[in-house]
C-alpha cells in the first residue's frame, strides 16, 4: 500500500474534528496556493521510498483551486468504485458464459436415441422414394397392355397431356402451389438404389422404353383408364420428369375410384416432396390416408414431417408405420434420428438463450464502461498534460541535484540575504558563476565561524553584471540552447515567443501542419561559402539599351556525368511548364540587391550583361539567374540556368545550385524529386541549415513527419549563420514542443513518427505509454542548460520508468562556451583534474512487475529515400556518443545497415516463421465486381451444392502441368487454409450480409455449372476448396482459371496455386508460380509478400528479406512484412551467431 505524503493526492488522513480539521485545511490551502513547478503528488512505497507520481490525477493544471482538487478526489474515488463494479460484472459474465463449443458432438455420442440411430438425421435421405403397387389392389398390369406386341425402333412415350386435355378437376389438387407450378418443378437425381427403377421392368420383363411404348398404345385405345395413367406416372418417375408425373397422376386421380386414389396420391406426393414442396406433399399423403391404412403412406408422411421439422408428427407417423410392419429397420432408424435431432435442437435453443442473455449483460457492461470512460475524461480535463508533468519533474530533479551536490552531496543554505552560504561539513563546495550563488561573499562550514573567502577560477573580470542578473531572473529554460545559427541565446532575449512559443501562439499561428503550397522556399547564397559577385554598376552597360533577360543557353555546357542523372528528367516534365511566380524567391531577389523599388526588367538586364561579360565565376551568375527566373515563374529557364550552374560549379560548391534547384521543385509540388537533390547536397556539404530546412519542408509535404522533424532538429544543431532560417523557427519549435497539437505521435518501438488522421479508427491503443520524442529533446536541452551539474532520479509513468543520470565533468575549458567554475573550501586541484562531465543520459526501463505487451505495428510513414534512415528519430539518448571502431576483417556493423541491435532483438516479439501465412489476391484488385458474376440476392431453395471444376481439362501451355505439384495433385499432402473462411464469407459484403460457407459454395456452384469458362468463377471455386482443404479440387479449378484467364489476370489464380504448393511443402514449384505472379503484376504487394513467405519456408532468409523489403516499398504500412523483416534480422544475428547478413 502506498501512503500519500506532501500535498496529498488521495487525502488519506484519519478522521478528525475541531481544531485539527481546521489546521489541516489551512495547511492544505497554504500549500495549494503556492503554484510551484514541482510535483504535487507523492507516495511512500512499500519499501519506504518517497516517490513522486508523475502521471497522477492530482497533478492539476490549477493546483491552487481547492474546489477542483476536492472534486478531483471525489471523481477518483467514484472511478475506483465503478472499476470494482465493472470487474465484478465482467467476472460474473465470464463465469456464466456458455462456452460449450462441443455440445453437438457430445450429444451425438451420449444420447441414447443418437446411439440407436447411428447417424445424424441430416445424413439420412429423407427423400426416400416410396410407391404403392397395382398388385396391392389385385390389379395385374398385363391385363392393360399387350406385352407380346412388337415395339418399333423409335418407341413412343406416354405423354398424358397429348392423350387427354384434362379440364379442371376437384380431385386433382390443382389448388396446391406445387401442382400449379408443375412446369418449374426441380428434379434432383434419383439414387440408383431407388426401388422405383425395378418395379415395372421386373414385373413385365421388358425395358423401360418398351414399357413406355406399350403404355402409350394402351392409352391410345383407352383414354380413361386410371390404371394406365398410374403406370404412366411410374414410367415418368423412373425417367425423373416431375412435370409428366404430375400430369399423369392428376388424370389417374380424376378417373380412379375413391379406394384406388392412394396409388396416384403417393406418386404425386413423392414428386412434390423431392421438388421441395414438402408441405403440399403432406396434404396429398393425408388424403391418401383417408382412403387406405397402408404402411407406405405413414412411412412417406414420416419422412415429409421430418424434413419440415415437425418432429412430433414425424415420430407418430413412424410409430404407425411400425405398427403396420413391425421391425422395419428404416422406420426404426429414422424415428430415433428424429428424436436425437429434436433433443439437440432443444439444447441448442437453450444455449442460444444463454448466449443472448450473456450478450445483453455485455451490452449493459459496455454502457457502464462507456460511462467510466466519460468520467475518466472529466478527470483528465483538469489534470496536467503528461509532457508538462515530465517537464516540471525534470526541473525539480535538476534543482534537487543542485542543492545536493554543492559539496560532496551536502546541503548548503543561503543566508544573510543570499550573501553567505552555510554548509554542514568542511568539504569542498562548488558553485557556478551566473547561477543563484552569484552574490555569495563567503561560506560558513559547520557551526563554528570558520569561513573562506571566494576564490575565483578562470573568472571573467569583464563580465557584464547586469546581464548576469538578468539571466538569473529569467527562466533557465531560456538558456537551454546556447547557440542557434551563429547567435547565442541572448540574441533571442526579445524573441522568446519564437524560441519558446506557447501552445496558444502555436494554435493561432499554425493551427495545422502546413501543406506543400504554404511552406516557404529558400535560396542558398554563395556568400555562405565565402564567394561574392562583383556588384554591377551603370558603367557596365547603357541604361538606354532595350531591356534584356538573362539567357543561360549561350554559356558553354559541359555534361557532368556524376549528377546529370538527378536532373535529366526535369527538362521534359509537363508539370514544370506552367508559369508560377515564386513570391519568396522575389523577396530574396530584391533583398540581394538591397533595393525593393527596382523593376524586374532592370534586374534581368543586370544579369544579361553579367552573363555576357562575367566578372566572377560564371556558375555564380547562373545561380543568380536561376533565382531571377524562379521569381518570374519561368521554370524552363530557371532549370536551364541552375543545371548549367550545377555542371560548371566546383565539386565542393555543387550543393548551392542543388539546393536552389530543389526549392524550385518544391514550389512546383515535386517534393519527392526535391528530396533526392537535397540528399545529394547533404552528401556534399552537411553544414548548411538551409539545406536541412528545405529537406524538412519537402518531407512535410510528403507527410513524412518523422523525417521532417529530424531534418529540423539537425538544422537547429548547426552553428552556421543563417538569418534566412529564422522565419521558420517558430514552426519548428511548435512541432517540437506540441506534437499532439498536430496529431503527431511517436512510436516507442520503431522510432518513427506518424501523423494520424482525425477520427481514424485504425490506430489501436498501446498498452505502453508513448512518450513524445520532443520531451526527450527537452531533457537533452536541460543538460545544456546546466552543463556543469549532475543529478540522478527516476520518473514513473504508467508502467514506464524514465531514469535520469548526470555524470560530472570539470576539466572543460572556457573554449566550451560554458560558465566558469568557482570553489570554496578545501578544493584540491587533482580532484578537478580527475573529474569530468560527459553526456547526459536518458534511458527508459520497463518496470519488472508490469507485463506489458508490444503493440502491433500501425500505419507508419517511412522515408522514401534509401538513406532516409539518417533522419529517423532516435528515442534513446545513450551518451557519451563515442565513435565505434572501424570494421575488422569482413564483419560489418549491422546497426549501420539499419538492423536492430541484439538488445532490441531480445525485447522484440518474434514472428513464428514456420507458421504458414495464407494470402489471397481478390478479383476486385482487377476492377472486377464479384456481385456481377455471383448472385447473392436470390434466396437459396435447393439443397446445398459444391462447385466442381473439370478435372479432366486437357493439358495446355497455361495449366502448368509440367510442375510436379500440379501433375500429381491427387497425392498432395495439403492441410487446408481454414483461415481464409472469413474472406470467402465476406464476398459481396458491401452490398449483401455475410453468408455461411455452404451458402457461398452453393451460389458459386450454381453459376459455375452454367459457365465453366469463367476464370473468375473458377478462382472463387478454388478459394472454396482451399478453405475445405481439398487440394486436388482446388488445383482443378485453378488449372481451369489459368486456361481461360487473360495474361494480365493470371496472377490471381497463380497466387492461390503458390499458396497451395507452399502448404504442401513443394517450395520449388511455389517459387516458380509466385515469381510468375510477380512478373505479371509487380505493382501488387501481396505478390511480393507471397514470394517472401516461400523463401522463408526454404530458409533462404536473405532472399526473403529482399522480397519483404520490396513489399514495404509498395505498401509501407504493411505490418506483417515489417515484423517478418525484424524477426529474420534478429534470427540471422542471434540464432546463427552472425553480426551481418
From Swiss-Prot:
Disulfide bonds: none annotated. GO terms for biological process: actin filament polymerization; cilium organization. The keyword Oxidoreductase does not apply. GO terms for cellular component: actin cytoskeleton; cytoplasm; cytosol; plasma membrane. It comes from the Eukaryota. SMART domains: TPR (SM00028). Belongs to the TTC17 family. This is Tetratricopeptide repeat protein 17. It comes from Homo sapiens (Human). The lineage of its organism: Eukaryota, Metazoa, Chordata, Craniata, Vertebrata.
